[in-house]
Regions:
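Active-site catalytic microenvironments in core metabolic enzymes, especially phosphate/sugar-handling
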Residues: 1-167
């Protein structure tokens, strides 16, 4: 059994890298510096400009979600995004994204006051959920392990760890 959390968020090739790859972002850089060469979160450019509504549907499709929560005007044009997998709703992270000219921030665990803050600073937010912004790493890790240790069977858990549901 292999289990990792924050170290996998920060690692190059970890959850934030995987989400930026999944969303096909270009010119990707780090969001929040945590060490000399390590960052939590990513900033990057979409292949093409989209409205918030279009981007939300794109994220929903890429994360295999039936629904998601957004904050902001659905017709806002988005070209540059910041992201932080898991519960990256820290106001500092959103402010860094805004200071770097991001029009949208993608994370999980968005709450009422987080959305209020984002609106106050003029930043759209897409909540891809804590679970679904992180579970995307499982097949990536499984493939990595298979390549590094070919004689060891690597089985990805099929258990859905999402604890919230919408009726």
């Amino acid at each position: 059994i292999y289990s990792a959390h924050t170290n996998l968020d920060i690692a190059e090739g970890g959850t934030n890298s995987t989400l930026s790859n999944l969303l096909e972002l270009n010119n990707v850089t780090g969001l929040f510096q945590t060490g000399e060469t390590s960052f939590l979160g990513k900033i990057g450019y979409l292949k093409q400009e989209m409205t918030l509504n279009e981007l939300a549907n794109f994220v929903k499709e890429k994360l295999n979600l039936n629904h998601l929560v957004i904050s902001g005007n659905k017709s806002t044009k988005i070209k540059k995004v910041g992201l932080c997998t898991g519960k990256g709703t820290d106001a500092d992270f959103m402010q860094i994204a805004k200071n770097n000219d991001c029009q949208c921030y993608i994370t999980g665990g968005l709450g009422y006051h987080d959305a209020q803050y984002a609106q106050d600073i003029g930043l759209c937010v897409i909540d891809g959920t804590h679970y679904f912004t992180e579970v995307i790493i499982v097949p990536v890790l499984c493939e990595y392990i298979k390549n590094k240790i070919p004689n060891v069977e690597c089985v990805c858990s099929k258990i859905n760890g999402q604890t919230l549901d919408i009726l």
